[in-house]
UniProtKB/Swiss-Prot annotation:
It is a multi-pass membrane protein. It is found in: Mitochondrion outer membrane. GO terms for cellular component: ERMES complex; SAM complex. Lacks alpha-helical transmembrane segments, suggesting that it resides in the membrane via beta-sheet conformations similar to those predicted for other outer membrane proteins and porin. It comes from the Eukaryota. The lineage of its organism: Eukaryota, Fungi, Dikarya, Ascomycota, Pezizomycotina. The keyword Electron transport does not apply. Belongs to the MDM10 family. GO terms for biological process: establishment of mitochondrion localization; mitochondrial genome maintenance; mitochondrial outer membrane translocase complex assembly; mitochondrion-endoplasmic reticulum membrane tethering; phospholipid transport; protein insertion into mitochondrial outer membrane. It comes from Aspergillus flavus (strain ATCC 200026 / FGSC A1120 / IAM 13836 / NRRL 3357 / JCM 12722 / SRRC 167). The gene is mdmB. Component of the ER-mitochondria encounter structure (ERMES) or MDM complex, composed of mmm1, mdm10, mdm12 and mdm34. Associates with the mitochondrial outer membrane sorting assembly machinery SAM(core) complex. Keywords: Membrane, Mitochondrion, Mitochondrion outer membrane, Transmembrane, Transmembrane beta strand. This is Mitochondrial distribution and morphology protein 10.
């Protein structure tokens, strides 16, 4: 489950119309959400609040061997007036990433008044307030204290600047300066393609990521153009560090159906619709990815599909051409939808929908109905298993005013010293290997926000 601050950052991206799917770093985001989710460690409590439309705070207390915690603050020039902040009102699908429908690429919005300094230099607010900006800082306690800071800024309709700082305080008796690193990322998204330029002070690492979308350019699209049914994207990334002589690169492909492929097309104005026009192009959304890392010889393919609004599956197969090692992972998620109270008027609604003219558009109603179904879900169950029978089970749901996340990890490769000691004492053995224990760990995370 995402933290409250991550949820606010996603709301900032949506509020500034930034398409996070049009990035090479999000090429396998759907498969990672279904296969690489993490389970909570021990007990952790999150208390968060959106005290003003522009300011949020969050406090975390956890017990992972030792008691630890963190304090977070966030400020944004974009007000979150319409963003649900109470834990009882936040849609669970916003906090629990699962199968995500890829957003179609769109042309950047040009009406930001970014050139107001040249047009009317006398009536101009400070540039800090004219462009969407977000500041976020988290202090992790107890010592060694770690400070994480984040700076986000939309410098233009197509440019996005990110500065991330991580500083760790040394031991109490150490006189050395705190270890710190800075990561700078400049993103450029035109809808047709996107580029990301990265630099990290850690080993002076330089990086580049790019993504290209096949098909028409959204900047030259017209209002009468038919919606796209699918999207094919190709991307690559490269890294180089002159200090450590580190070189890395990868490339990948992604094919995904778009929302228009699973929607039932609207009927013609004359009311005569053929059989092909009354059925969707695809019965369910799906996403295919292929990634290749030439230097290490790693090849990975994923296939994710949403069989129903409340059920999704995903699988991944990896192979290394140098070591001949392979990996196979499968996972699924099952959403539980809360039952709506029956007011006895459903028969009237069905009769009214049946009597509507065929020429009325159906897409807005379908999108509204789909959104209502997603907001009505109150729990999700995720299961993941690999070829070594390592199993992770995660349940996330709403309990009264709280958002609860509980998970357990099972696997044959872990060993328990206590179980080995008990077995050795009972059998009289003084040496030997440990008894395998399938119990890897269990944890519960509780989130409350106001």
């Amino acid at each position: 489950m995402l933290d409250f601050m991550d949820y606010i950052q996603l709301a900032f991206a949506e509020g500034t119309n930034w398409n996070r799917d049009n990035s090479y770093s999000s090429l396998t985001a759907t498969a990672q959400s279904l296969l690489d989710f993490s389970t909570p460690e021990r007990l952790r409590v999150h208390l968060s609040s959106l005290s003003t439309p522009n300011f949020a705070t969050s406090y975390t207390l956890g017990t992972v061997g030792l008691i630890d915690g963190s304090v977070s603050y966030l400020y944004s020039t974009v007000p979150f007036t319409n963003t649900p902040s109470r834990s009882a009102l936040i849609p669970l699908r916003k906090l629990s990433p699962g199968y995500r429908q890829v957003t179609p690429p769109s042309a950047p919005i040009e009406d930001w008044n970014l050139d107001s300094i040249l047009d009317n230099p006398q009536n101009v607010q400070p540039s800090f307030a004219s462009k969407p900006t977000l500041l976020h800082a988290t202090l992790h306690l107890p010592p060694p204290t770690t400070l994480n800071a984040l700076f986000l800024r939309r410098i233009s309709p197509t440019m996005h600047l990110t500065l991330a700082v991580c500083s760790t305080r040394g031991p109490p008796l150490s006189k050395s300066a705190p270890q710190a690193s800075l990561l700078t990322q400049l993103s450029h998204d035109t809808g047709k393609y996107s580029n990301e330029y990265l630099f990290s002070t850690d080993n002076a690492l330089f990086g580049w990521r790019g993504l290209w979308n096949f098909g028409p350019d959204p900047r030259s699209a017209t209002d009468t153009a038919a919606p796209r049914l699918s999207l094919l994207s190709a991307g690559a990334e490269a890294y180089y560090s002159p200090v450590s002589s580190l070189i890395g690169m990868s490339t990948g492909l992604r094919f995904s159906t778009l929302p228009a492929a699973t929607d039932v097309p609207a009927s013609t104005a004359t009311g005569s619709a053929t059989a092909n026009q009354s059925t969707p192009i695809s019965t369910f959304p799906y996403t295919l990815t292929l990634t290749l890392t030439p230097l290490t010889g790693s090849l990975s393919t994923t296939y994710s599909l949403r069989a129903s609004p409340n059920l999704a599956f995903s699988s991944r197969f990896g192979f290394n051409v140098y070591s001949w090692e392979s990996e196979m992972v499968a996972g699924c998620e099952l959403w539980r939808k809360s039952r709506k109270q029956d007011d006895g008027l459903e028969w009237a609604r069905r009769k009214m929908r049946a009597s509507e003219p065929l020429s009325l558009p159906s897409l807005p109603a379908e999108s509204t109905e789909r959104q209502e179904e997603e907001e009505a879900t109150d729990s999700v169950l995720k299961i993941r298993v690999d070829q070594s029978w390592n199993v992770r089970v995660l349940w996330e749901g709403r309990v009264k005013e709280l958002l609860v996340s509980a998970g357990v990890g099972l696997g044959p490769s872990s060993f328990s010293s206590s179980s080995w000691a008990a077995a050795a004492a009972g059998s009289g053995q003084s040496s030997g290997g440990g008894v395998p224990s399938y119990w890897r760990g269990v944890g519960v995370s509780v989130l409350y926000s106001s």
